[in-house]
């Protein structure tokens, strides 16, 4: 079974909205072994909708449409499809009761417009909308498009996602005829080319039914290993074998084989070891602390964060020696080390990290170009002494990208030090 996704809405074509629905649907379908061969974006015009649906139904066994279901004048999908299939409308009583109850609980009258929302195309299966009002539909398109299924869902992401998870995926999973396993391999501190060179033997010997996708992002690159086949046990075993082969080749750069962020791994390790962390930031402007505290449960390990953007703040709040700044500059490994040590001593944390750098677009020099960052790490040793180290990196991006990459470098430093610490 192959699928095509159609995203309907003038707002998508005009660039007023980003289409997040199509990637979500593609991922959900991929998880049950249904590949997406095409994604179409079309306007709210009824003829454009009919043309897009006709094309899709001639090419794929399953077509998934989002957008154009609802009470407003630009919600034209249902009627366009009804006309294409030559069918009437029928009231779906459960949907109407759900809509009526939704408005009664808000002390609003039930109108004919609301009743119209509960009308579905004859012969369809109504998809309950647990996050809104307009129901979706699963339609068998015979006789004109025999053997084809058409799914209509609202364009509101929360409504569509609930329909996919609760109704659509369970409906189509038994029809896919295949099992599929996706396993992410999350890496840190390595570029796409270097990673590809490192695992070239694994990639050259991939078995039939297994693919490897490189997923570059602002902070680096990760991999997605996908395996499909007729027997779940074989699929799982083959997928696991390939993942293990990648980890064997690139292990020191791999921080997880599940979809977790680097900050989640760091926070979970801190919590597991009952350690606390504090951060002293300059060039990242609070981003590092924000990423750590985005992780649920981080209050159990994150003590405090200081944004010491100016040299005066570094001296006053962290105890950085003005002579160190004078001799080496604020963006230097000696300053990063003093920032990390000062943060550790003043916070009482078990480990601390500092960032000082040049995010750009100005401020760079030949010796310290834009994108330079120095990361300091300080941690307590079992004998009460303090271990302090710093490293310098040069990133290549705009100001926003550099700040993300700077924070990623700091998280990498934290993770490496945590794995080295003795207890």
From Swiss-Prot:
Transmembrane segments: none
Pfam families assigned: CinA, CinA_KH, MoCF_biosynth
InterPro entries per the UniProt record, alphabetical: CinA (IPR050101), CinA-like_C (IPR036653), CinA_C (IPR008136), CinA_KH (IPR041424), Competence-induced_CinA (IPR008135), MoaB/Mog-like_dom_sf (IPR036425), MoaB/Mog_dom (IPR001453)
SUPFAM superfamilies: CinA-like, Molybdenum cofactor biosynthesis proteins
HAMAP family: CinA_B (MF_00226_B)
PANTHER family for this protein: NICOTINAMIDE-NUCLEOTIDE AMIDOHYDROLASE PNCC, NMN AMIDOHYDROLASE-LIKE PROTEIN YFAY
NCBIfam families referenced in this protein's UniProt entry, alphabetically: cinA_nterm (TIGR00200), PncC_domain (TIGR00199), PRK00549.1 (NF001813)
UniProt similarity note: Belongs to the CinA family.
Protein name: CinA-like protein
Origin species: Chlorobaculum tepidum (strain ATCC 49652 / DSM 12025 / NBRC 103806 / TLS) (Chlorobium tepidum)
């Amino acid at each position: 079974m192959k699928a095509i996704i159609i995203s309907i809405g003038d707002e998508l074509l005009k660039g007023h909205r980003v289409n997040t629905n199509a990637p979500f649907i593609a991922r959900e379908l991929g998880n049950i072994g249904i590949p997406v061969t095409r994604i179409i974006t079309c306007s709210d015009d009824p003829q454009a909708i009919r043309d897009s649906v006709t094309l899709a139904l001639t090419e794929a066994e399953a077509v998934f449409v989002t957008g154009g279901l609802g009470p407003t004048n630009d919600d034209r999908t249902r009627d366009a499809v009804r006309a294409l299939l030559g069918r009437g409308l029928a009231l779906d009583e459960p949907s109407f009761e759900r809509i009526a109850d939704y408005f009664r609980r808000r002390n609003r009258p039930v109108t004919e417009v609301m009743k119209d929302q509960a009308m579905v195309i004859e012969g369809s299966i109504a998809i309950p909308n647990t996050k809104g009002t307009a129901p979706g539909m699963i339609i068998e398109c015979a006789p004109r498009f025999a053997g084809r299924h058409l799914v209509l869902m609202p364009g509101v992401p929360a409504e569509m996602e609930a329909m996919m998870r609760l109704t659509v995926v369970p409906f189509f999973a038994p029809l896919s005829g295949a099992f599929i396993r996706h396993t992410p391999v999350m890496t840190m501190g390595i570029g796409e080319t270097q990673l590809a060179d490192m695992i070239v033997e694994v990639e050259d010997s991939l078995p039939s039914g297994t693919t490897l996708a490189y997923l570059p992002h602002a902070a680096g690159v990760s991999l997605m290993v996908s395996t499909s086949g007729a027997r779940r046990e074989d699929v799982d075993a083959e997928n696991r074998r390939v993942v293990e082969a990648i980890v064997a080749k690139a292990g020191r750069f791999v921080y997880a084989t599940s979809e977790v962020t680097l900050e989640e791994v760091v926070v979970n390790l801190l919590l597991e070891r009952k350690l606390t962390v504090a951060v002293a930031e300059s060039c990242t402007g609070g981003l590092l602390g924000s990423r750590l505290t985005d992780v649920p449960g981080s209050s159990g390990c994150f003590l405090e964060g200081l944004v010491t953007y100016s040299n005066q703040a570094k001296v006053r709040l962290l105890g950085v020696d003005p002579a160190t700044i004078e001799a080496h500059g604020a963006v230097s490994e000696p300053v990063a080390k003093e920032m990390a040590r000062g943060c550790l001593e003043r916070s009482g944390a078990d480990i601390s990290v500092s960032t000082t750098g040049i995010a750009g677009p100005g401020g760079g020099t030949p010796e310290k170009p834009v994108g330079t960052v120095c990361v300091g790490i300080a941690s307590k040793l079992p004998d009460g002494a303090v271990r302090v180290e710093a490293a310098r990196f040069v990133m290549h991006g705009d100001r926003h990208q550099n700040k993300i990459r700077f924070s990623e470098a700091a998280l990498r430093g934290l993770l490496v030090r945590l794995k080295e610490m003795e207890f």
